[in-house]
């Protein structure tokens, strides 16, 4: 049962939209659209729709900042349910590629984020275990995963009193991808101490599952906090999932290896016939090494390129994705596409770019042809999935409107009574000086400023210039990872700095009630960043504050500017009439600032600054131990054993306090 927790009730405008959407979905309509202005409470409307329908829901968005914000909000809305987070676990990713013209092969290079990997595994585990799941996902949901039926077939179910020999249990754990590690115990590891076995599930954060045996009988089972060395909740039954969505059973693995060998022989015969000896040798060496790894360990580097064989699909079949984990046992589910006017075009463009790169790798003997089936969903496959869709946007594109037909529900009024922001045109000749004067007034009121520019260079120079003038300002760019981006937004809201400058990162969905001034530099430069949709979305960031104002710096009024201003002014008239009718006085949105996503790093900073450890609460000390332990393991992996030993000694000191 999905249970919504909120101190607020939907406004009349929201109630009408919720009622219409729920009725449309219950009637069986596949597509519907919520057209809601910025600040009208679209997220709260989405939460109420989910509560009324009471079915598993996938919420997709096009960028990681918005995903992080949605995750925080829905964790609050559905605090008693399973709210999950599924975005790419790469902090950095360079896919393998080959450039024939220069004969340059670019090896795959990446760095993964362990926390994001854990959250992804938690998402699939929850989907296979519970019905009350809300999952926030990026475009990653469209990329290939393992077969959910094979994955669920690999689970290990523990029940008190069950009979299993230690040898058999350890073999099963290894088959599931868990590694024995009695010294540096970490996620996806297990350790053995006599009749006690500790298992650290790959999707857990701080706890392990401790199993106590009497001979071959499972005598006791409970959660155990490895940081605080404390016993947790007793368990009567526990389901353990594998360490990877690509894990497969022994039978399937043997068949996959057989199929890969057959495809390899066929491809080698082709290269030999075409007298392509370099490609022949390259492919033979690569695939035979991967086969050796698969045979001995069940995994290999780039295992996803053999996904077709591991999942048992045929050439050209639709790959398994997160959607298939939702649809397990033919379960009904809802897909909400947030900021659909941007998300859907992004989903549409994914397949072509991926295919072009991989085709070159196949042609030149770096990969087998089956690697082409390790791909994202084609747009038609995505949009025709066996589920129902709700598109959400302040500016839906023609595609959403066409698909939804008459099932379009408007949400123009804001529960707070806030109007669309006032728009002022300013001469772009003196835009830097004018903005400085306007920003000072806003900052004196303890409010914030967002600035959007067209180039990275201008953003950097503007940041440097305003810092010299004494304004606390930061610049947000595309190189910043998801967690750091969230920290910057938290910093702006909390007052750590007063102005944030960006290019295309300050548009859709960011909920920043403290921001009362939006400055759009060079607003008259027609293009993607200054289209009607972009302007309306950017201006909407000021619609959560009663003092909201937008400055458009320009030399002329473009068609896009005029359309954006006309739409905004028309909405202001409707909103003023609504406020008068219901006697509403506009008030700024009040929204608590979410906790940091990287508390562990902050605690590390406290420690390094010499905070007295004996005065630190036990819970904070435990988190600090966790951070130091992570650093110790990283040092050990890098063969920096002296550093690892020094960190170990610090951990022991902390545990002795």
Swiss-Prot record:
Motif Beta-hairpin: which ranges? 89-112
Keywords, A to Z, come to: ATP-binding, Cytoplasm, DNA damage, DNA excision, DNA repair, Excision nuclease, Nucleotide-binding, SOS response
SMART domains named among the record's database cross-references: DEXDc, HELICc
Any single GO BP term: SOS response
**What does this gene product do?**
The UvrABC repair system catalyzes the recognition and processing of DNA lesions. A damage recognition complex composed of 2 UvrA and 2 UvrB subunits scans DNA for abnormalities. Upon binding of the UvrA(2)B(2) complex to a putative damaged site, the DNA wraps around one UvrB monomer. DNA wrap is dependent on ATP binding by UvrB and probably causes local melting of the DNA helix, facilitating insertion of UvrB beta-hairpin between the DNA strands. Then UvrB probes one DNA strand for the presence of a lesion.
Per the database record, which ranges form the Helicase ATP-binding domain?
23-414
This chain belongs to the protein called UvrABC system protein B
Q: Which Gene3D superfamilies match?
A: P-loop containing nucleotide triphosphate hydrolases, UVR domain
**PANTHER family named among the record's database cross-references:** UVRABC SYSTEM PROTEIN B
- Subunit organization: Forms a heterotetramer with UvrA during the search for lesions. Interacts with UvrC in an incision complex.
Q: Does the keyword NADP apply?
A: no
Report the residue ranges that make up the Helicase C-terminal domain in this protein: 431-593
Gene Ontology cellular-component terms for this entry are:
cytoplasm; excinuclease repair complex
Highest taxon of the source?
Bacteria
CDD domains in alphabetical order: DEXHc_UvrB (cd17916), SF2_C_UvrB (cd18790)
Q: Which GO terms describe its molecular function?
A: ATP binding; ATP hydrolysis activity; DNA binding; excinuclease ABC activity
Its primary localisation, in coarse terms, equals cytoplasm
Per its UniProt record, what InterPro entries does this chain match? Answer: Helicase/UvrB_N, Helicase_ATP-bd, Helicase_C-like, P-loop_NTPase, UVR_dom, UVR_dom_sf, UvrB, UvrB_inter
